Curated annotation (Swiss-Prot):
Pathway: Carbohydrate degradation; glycolysis; pyruvate from D-glyceraldehyde 3-phosphate: step 4/5. It is found in: Cytoplasm; Secreted; Cell surface. It comes from Deinococcus deserti (strain DSM 17065 / CIP 109153 / LMG 22923 / VCD115). Coiled coil: none annotated. Gene3D superfamilies: Enolase-like C-terminal domain, Enolase-like, N-terminal domain. Mg(2+) binds at D240, E283, D310. Binds a second Mg(2+) ion via substrate during catalysis. GO terms for molecular function: magnesium ion binding; phosphopyruvate hydratase activity. This is Enolase. The gene is eno. The active site is at E203, K335. Its EC number is 4.2.1.11. Keywords: Cytoplasm, Glycolysis, Lyase, Magnesium, Metal-binding, Secreted.
Length: 422
């Protein structure tokens, strides 16, 4: 199962921006391929995404990252056994030699890392989720379906980035997807009836110019009920306000509402919403380095609401360990391109599970047809996945792959519903 050659190319993501695709060819003739995603709202502690700059593709080209794969990263792993993922990733990171993968680019390293695992699974003739997770990989994730987009993901007046539904009362993943999809179609009718546009944002959710952030919750609840479901029982609400994007000079600027909140006021804001609405999960409710604020929020509502660190933890075991040690948050969002290798992503998931933190496998706003994260969610029995709305083929690709996996597992498939929540 030795690696014979590694090639890369520049392809486009769902926003029409260049990204890296890598192919790992084995001496047996099997090939693994992977396309890396890209985020719009990125944490400052993420692995570096290498872009070319200049005028080509408005500076977003990745030709240098592609060259790094073919001229440096690929040659470093040629001849190695593709099934030795830890050794492969260590070799890739040794070529880079920087803490944030700033020399080769996290996008270059990750493309090769993921493609290697796919190549190994192909040669062994096993599904990717089984290769990564073994015989106990059987838990289908509860989808966090992003139905209303705001913030950096949409050109509208909504400050907060994602308003999601979670079908926690569904018996299976297949039914959960139906619950969420029916709510998506119901929401379109609700928005139209209120005179709002039904254009969609980067992740396939609607991006209406609502009168306030709270109106997003109100239209979601109406859509859930009109779809025939009970809010809080069949379908709950999850939020990703991504407030690092709103944090300026030590305060949180809710521009659309003309309000500026202190950390203490932001904590009270979320506690109030959690009291009045069926909100079961809040991601990045405070800024990525507002550790004191995070601690206060966790103390206040962490016993009843899943508090997810995305920009806070950036899929980094070291930052997660700090959160564990200081009682900050109770769940981690896992984005493979934040840390830049499969091994480090798996390490973060293992650390979270060891300390009873929830795990949510996530896409990025710039995605592709690559469905790797669907297999990763099942492989790690993560229990939850964020991969957008019920529209745009780059999002649907992940849902369809999960449907295939559930079908293949048959009676062995597990859907945890509410039990998946931290």
């Amino acid at each position: 199962m030795n690696i014979e050659k590694v090639i890369a190319r520049e392809v486009l993501d769902s926003r029409g921006n260049p990204t890296v695709e890598a192919e790992v060819h084995l001496d047996s003739g099997f090939v693994g391929r992977a396309i890396v995603p890209s985020g719009a709202s990125t944490g400052t502690h993420e692995a570096l995404e290498l872009r070319d700059g200049g005028s080509r593709y408005m500076g977003k080209g990745v030709q240098q990252a592609v060259r790094n794969v073919e001229e440096a990263l690929g040659p470093a792993i040629v001849g190695l056994d593709a099934s030795e993922q830890i050794a492969i990733d260590a070799a890739l990171m040794a070529v880079d030699g920087t803490p944030n993968k700033g020399k080769m680019g996290g996008n270059a390293i990750l493309a090769v890392s993921l493609a290697t695992s796919r190549a190994a699974a192909e040669e062994l003739g096993v599904p990717l989720y089984r290769y990564l997770g073994g015989s106990n990989a059987k838990t289908l994730p509860v989808p966090m379906m992003n139905l209303i987009n705001g913030g950096a993901h949409a050109d509208n007046s909504v400050d907060f980035q994602e308003f999601m539904v979670m079908p926690i009362g569904a018996p299976t993943f297949r039914e959960a997807l139906r619950y969420g999809t029916e709510t998506f179609h119901s929401l379109k009718k609700v928005l139209s009836s209120r005179g709002y546009n039904t254009n969609v944002g980067d992740e396939g959710g609607f991006a209406p110019d609502l009168k306030s952030n709270e109106e997003a919750l109100q239209v979601l609840l109406e859509a859930i009920e009109k779809a025939g479901y009970e809010p809080g029982k069949d379908i709950a609400i999850a939020l990703d306000p991504a407030v690092t994007e709103l944090y300026k000079d030590g305060h949180y600027d809710l521009e659309s509402e003309g309000r500026t909140l202190s950390t203490a006021e932001m904590v009270d804001f979320w506690a109030d919403w959690a009291d009045r609405y069926p909100i079961v999960s809040i991601e990045d409710g405070l800024a990525e380095d507002d550790w004191d604020g995070w601690q206060a929020l966790t103390t206040k509502i962490g016993d009843r609401v899943q508090l997810v660190g995305d920009d806070l933890f950036v899929t980094n075991p070291e930052r997660l360990q700090r959160g564990i040690d200081t009682g900050v948050g109770n769940a981690i969002l896992v984005k493979v391109n934040q840390i830049g290798s499969l091994t480090e992503s798996m390490d973060a998931i293992e650390l979270a599970k060891r300390h009873h933190y929830g795990t949510i496998i996530s896409h990025r706003s710039g995605e592709s047809e690559d469905s790797f994260i669907a297999d990763l969610a099942v492989a790690t029995n993560a229990g939850q996945i964020k991969t957008g709305s019920a529209s745009r083929s780059d999002r649907i690709a992940k849902y369809n792959q999960l449907l295939r996996i559930e079908h293949a597992l048959g009676d062995r498939a597990v859907y945890l519903g509410r039990k998946a929540l931290r």
